[in-house]
């Protein structure tokens, strides 16, 4: 070894000695791996439905001002959104608090003390009044003021890892806010279209009740004329009572939905006025392939991902705690026993201090903290993997439901057309004078019943379409 390489080796020896003297780090837990969804999720939907990812404001496709207003009000005033926003602000403040520990700190301090020295204590000579010896005791008024600086050197990256962990939490909270936003929008839209479905069903039931009343009036007239017996009108009366009961049930459901909408949108009035509109037929959106794209379009998956990243940085910070901790301190002050001497140049004092903390034996505290960080990280990864599996299953389940309901709607549409043909035949026979008008009403009631069934199926299809939109991320994009 030559002289040029000998001196650097000697200089590094104390550092190597310090590192060797640190508390030993034990690897007791194995990290889990993050799961990714399959490259493709086969939904077996018609090609017409595979027309891309939903838009971030997918509810605008309904072209319904009432719905848009309700969702905008919910996103602006709902308590859930306020909670999500405050969680982000809290995480940002915590990240800033950790980041400030990585820089130098400078403080100014000043103090004044009036004290009487004890002649029997350690400072006994200062209790004497001997100007020749420089003492003017026993009373002194001493003062100190000046600057104090400190700097914790983050050589091993502990503070940087903690800041990264906090920033990961901020990003996770932001993704959770978007998830809350989509859940709110989806909940409001589902309730709104459920209300519209019940409103349309109410109209059909009123038409059924009208036809039943026509039949009842005809039967009563025939009975009064002695043409029929009273027994023939009993079944119609029972059916009319059932229809009235259904109307009451529908009215109750509509009021419950209105109350839930008021709660979701944080509406300030006790009642909510909605106008009935026709149920739309909006094509559900489903891309041909999901795979990795689903990870970037589901806010809940992004939140879980950032919690994993945050936990990994927490592990780095826990590992850095095993290494020496170095602090620098400096002060520049004026210090005097008498206030009259405080501003003299001779009262100035200054100094620099370098501190080193070396963890040698800590009864396993550092390893316990590291185990906690690793366990929390594995828990975050396991939660992420679970969320990935559930996300893929949500899409597959919602897509299958949309397909099934689409087929049911097609079959129901054919049933309604057949029922209308029966009504047309009855109307033609009535126009020809072959049957009475009550027989036309009897033919209309089954057709109206099928129309009611069709409305319920259409409402279910709309609800499933909104659930599919939510399963696809609701337009969220990283």
Curated annotation (Swiss-Prot):
A lipid is attached at residue 22 (N-palmitoyl cysteine). It holds the Pfam family OEP. GO terms for biological process: response to antibiotic. GO terms for molecular function: efflux transmembrane transporter activity. Residues 1-21 form the signal peptide. Could be involved in resistance to puromycin, acriflavine and tetraphenylarsonium chloride. Belongs to the outer membrane factor (OMF) (TC 1.B.17) family. This is Multidrug resistance outer membrane protein MdtQ.
